[in-house]
Amino acid sequence: MKRILYIICSIFALSSCNYLDIVPTGKVIPEKVTEFRALLTNGYSAFPRYKYLLSLRSDEVMPIVGDSYYMDYIDFAIWQDNSPNTTVNYPWSSPYKAIFYTNSVIEDVMSAEEDTEEDSREQVKGEALLLRAYAHFDLLNLYGKPYKPESAISDRGIPIATQIDIEQKYEAATVEEVYKQIFADIKEGRELLQVEQQARNVQYRFSKRSAIALEARVRLYHQDWEDALALAEELIPSCPLENLNEETAGDPALITSKEAILSLEVIGSYYLNGGMHITSQLLGKYNQAGDKRFGMYFKENGN
């Protein structure tokens, strides 16, 4: 009887590995560079959707009372972070979703099979590191305290997520700790990048040029004034400007603009554009008669 039991146990032991190695139907476990690229694209797509909502927390725009989408946006405008409205998806969730995807790529892409000449393990990992840095940077400046050299070591920041662990309990790191992680990701990411400038149709991806732009912005917020200036001066000569005096000039905010360096953020929404109005404070900043930007950016619709 014992012998029969041993044989049965041995059969299960030998077969269990093969069973666990079976990929579930309809699922893809990334093993190739192209598959990790697709995974990272999910991270890119998760990142920018909240950006245009932040204008509602400034003095730039306000929701139109009575508009059909008014209730979807009013909580943002009045800084109501604990809204009873369950349809509101607050900005913190999108960057952390992007970070989840970047962590998946960072952990495993260097062992992936290179199945395309158009991408490399290094490029994909470099982009993932920079996207993770950008997401942490945005979160810190949304929910943490602004950087102050004298208190950053103790000022409350945001939780840092650099690994995939569904049981991990996240606690807020200090502002200095978050910046340390951001700079580490930027440094490693820039060392891995191989693409100087992405093609226009994939310009949401990080390149060597957009990585410089990101570090310049982070250095500025970190009050590294000289480093921020040096990085900006390194980049500016390769960035032409739109001449708004020409009829063929494009909107500098669009992906088609020759000014575009990184076209990642969603800066507007059809629903939001129709359900908000520009504040008098913002309009007052423009010379409405002579400023070319005014005619390009604003249109009167009766609201």
What is each PLM-predicted segment?
Residues 1-17:
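Sec-dependent bacterial lipoprotein signal peptides
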Residues 99-102, 179, 186, 232:
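Inward-facing hydrophobic residues that define packing positions of alpha-helical scaffold repeats
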Residues 93-95, 119, 126, 158, ...:
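Start-of-helix signal in alpha-solenoid helical-repeat scaffolds, especially tetratricopeptide repeats
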Residues 38, 223, 227-303:
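Hydrophobic-face positions in mid-chain alpha helices that act as interaction patches
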Residues 72-143, 191-193:
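Conserved, well-structured interaction surfaces
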Residues 119, 142-180:
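Short coil/linker segments at helix-helix boundaries
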Residues 17-58, 62, 232:
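Membrane-proximal, proline-rich intrinsically disordered regions
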Residues 135, 216-218:
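Residue-level signature for tetratricopeptide repeat
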